[in-house]
Amino acid sequence: MLRALLLSLTLITGLAQANTTQQSPISLDTDQGTLYGSLLVPQSDKPVPVALLIAGSGPTDRNGNNPEGGHNDALKKLAQVLARNGIASLRYDKRGVAASRAATPDEKDLSVERYVADVEGWAKLLRDDPRFDRLILIGHSEGALISSLAAPASQADALVSIAGPAYPVGQVLDMQLAMRLPPPLLAESRHMARCISST
């Protein structure tokens, strides 16, 4: 009996949520191609806050999934929780990833500056939408760094850093490379970093 009640409540809650939120595809045209995302908006008669979700490093898609780190839908789940609490959200595939792959198919053409410009472009799109009254940037890991760089030009009302770097970017890169590179390449990488920092 208890199982049937819990199952019924779960189904009703799911249906209620489906009726109170609307998910739609959204896109942003950039100078290198189109970026694609998902916009989740709670039903409301007045403007609501909107969160722009920025994924971390690597080939992480709009839902927070990375072929190197597994499938967990972390950003999708965050968007759903935000919607249940009256906050809209936009999550997107970064350039070079998933549906946005064609925007920058070659990894060597990716840069922090391009990622920042992308956040600023999405932010403008959201600020210009009358359904939204406040803009929140929520970045995970590298996305937290990108968010902090884009916040001033994006005119963000708030910034949330989830597992953002707490060390200087050079030290973060060194720690990440130390886990992946063989010793000779790591030594060469550290030598190049010292040369760059001394100029």
Where do the model's predicted regions map?
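N-terminal cap/lid segment of alpha/beta-hydrolase-fold proteins
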Residues: 19-46
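Short, surface-exposed "cap/lid" segments of acyl-processing enzymes
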Residues: 44-82
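Alpha/beta-hydrolase fold nucleophile elbow
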Residues: 129-141
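Residue in the alpha/beta-hydrolase core beta-strand immediately N-terminal to the catalytic nucleophile
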Residues: 136, 158-160
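Short glycine-enriched nucleophile-adjacent loop
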Residues: 144-154
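Accessory cap/linker subdomain of secreted extracellular hydrolases
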Residues: 162-199
